């Protein structure tokens, strides 16, 4: 059996491709928004209901998806959810009203809720602790790549055929990836092409809570009663509205505020997502650099990245001070970079403080918190954008991220959740 050096990087590349296609299906509706609103006579508020349907379903399914992944395993669980979102995305082409779009997008959101927990679980299986933020940065970059390629692909499909074809193409690509995932993904213990040296490197570099597979799983109640959970969940609640806004509203923002046509949207709407890619990658490399430069531990280094991203989010918060559309695009690029840098750090923190047997569940619960905020903010945008404009809403997003940075420094302790639970003596977590 031929051994492949550096196989963990091939695995994270496969995870990244899944994230790319998942976010392509997610952002197809945003890129097609001007056409959908015109052809189906959809108002801004009705469009917000479509976005909220996706976000609400994603919110509710986050902990469910995490639990299913922990029970079925990364390979089977992720494949099942990917097939579902592919089918539901293609079925969106059958919608003939905003209500039909909302139902279809809600189904897509429910299935795509597994995407980030699955990526995080795969990263915790395949990477030692010191490289995990890099791995998460790479698979998280897929979210912005998918969002980046959606505008030109969707505009091409609309011009060449119809908006329905855009959803069919996106769904078909995700289905093909799901089949590839079933074929190629394996846990390191089952991967025969993995060298002994790399297997030892992965296992020996993981924290104790990730090395032991026979440990009892923390219950949902124990996770919710742990302050470490809230130290991650609250900042994610405050940060996620920004990413939801970037994914769902930028094309419509360009159309309504600056009068961009479909061609101009295809030319510029992807740019903030390119910078979001850079934020994902750089945000993954910063924690080990901060550890080396400042002598801090892993959790503190993640907090520093979150803080840096929150400060940079002041950029898009000032978008209302400028009338030039190209300055606005530049500020959105800064925001894309900032959010994805801090988002990667927040997501990775779940695998830093929770054990392998509950990491997907914990991430699903923190994700539920994040997407609840995204759902609510989408409704706020739909209700207020046509009256007060988009600028005050971008300012609010900047304030949210700064508050999230404050919370993470005051609530999250610099130790695993198991240690925090044992110190409280109220509800001791199971020993790992």
Curated annotation (Swiss-Prot):
PROSITE patterns documented for this protein: MFS
Cross-referenced CDD domains: MFS_ExuT_GudP_like
Record keywords, A-Z: Cell inner membrane, Cell membrane, Membrane, Signal, Transmembrane, Transmembrane helix, Transport
Residues annotated as signal peptide: 1-31
Listed InterPro entries: MFS, MFS_dom, MFS_Na/Anion_cotransporter, MFS_trans_sf
Cytoplasmic side: 70-75, 121-138, 186-236, 286-293, 339-369, 413-432
Family under the similarity heading: Belongs to the major facilitator superfamily. Phthalate permease family.
Protein name as it appears in the record: Hexuronate transporter
Gene name of this polypeptide: exuT
């Amino acid at each position: 059996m031929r051994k492949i050096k550096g196989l963990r990087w091939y695995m994270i590349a496969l995870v990244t491709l899944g994230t790319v296609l998942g976010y392509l299906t997610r952002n197809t509706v945003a890129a097609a928004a001007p056409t959908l609103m015109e052809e189906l006579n959809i108002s801004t508020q009705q469009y917000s209901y479509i976005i909220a349907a996706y976000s609400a379903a994603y919110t509710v399914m986050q902990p469910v998806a995490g639990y299913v992944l922990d029970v079925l395993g990364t390979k089977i669980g992720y494949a099942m959810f990917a097939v579902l979102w592919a089918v539901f995305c293609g079925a969106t082409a059958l919608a003939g009203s905003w209500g039909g779009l909302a139902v279809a997008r809600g189904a897509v959101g429910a299935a795509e809720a597994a995407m980030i927990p699955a990526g995080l679980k795969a990263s915790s299986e395949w990477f030692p602790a010191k490289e995990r933020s890099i791995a998460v940065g790479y698979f998280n970059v897929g979210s912005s790549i998918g969002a980046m390629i959606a505008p030109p692909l969707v505009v091409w499909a609309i011009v060449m055929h119809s908006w329905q074809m855009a959803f069919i193409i996106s769904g078909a690509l995700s289905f093909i990836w799901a089949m590839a995932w079933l074929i190629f993904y394996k846990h390191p213990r089952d991967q025969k092409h993995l060298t002994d040296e790399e297997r030892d490197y992965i296992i020996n570099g993981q924290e104790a809570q990730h090395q032991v597979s026979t440990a009892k799983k923390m219950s949902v109640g124990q996770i919710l009663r742990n302050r470490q959970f809230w130290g991650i969940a609250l900042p994610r609640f405050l940060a996620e509205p920004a990413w939801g806004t970037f994914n769902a509203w930028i094309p419509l923002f360009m159309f309504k505020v600056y009068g961009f046509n479909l061609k101009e949207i295809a030319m510029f709407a992807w740019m903030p997502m390119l910078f979001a890619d850079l934020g994902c990658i750089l945000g993954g490399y910063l924690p080990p650099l901060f550890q080396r430069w400042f002598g801090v531990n892993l959790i503190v280094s993640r907090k520093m990245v979150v803080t840096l991203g929150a400060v940079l989010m002041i950029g898009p918060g000032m978008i209302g001070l400028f009338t030039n559309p190209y300055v606005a695009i530049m500020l959105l690029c800064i925001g894309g970079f900032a959010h994805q840098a801090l988002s990667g750090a927040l997501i990775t923190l779940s695998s830093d403080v929770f054990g392998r047997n509950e990491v997907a569940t914990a991430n699903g619960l923190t994700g539920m918190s994040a997407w609840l905020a995204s759902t609510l903010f989408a409704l706020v945008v739909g209700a207020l954008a046509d009256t007060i404009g988009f600028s005050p809403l971008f300012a609010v997003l900047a304030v949210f991220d700064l508050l999230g940075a404050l919370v993470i420094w005051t609530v999250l302790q610099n130790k695993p959740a198991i240690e925090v639970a044992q110190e409280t003596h109220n509800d001791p977590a199971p020993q790992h």
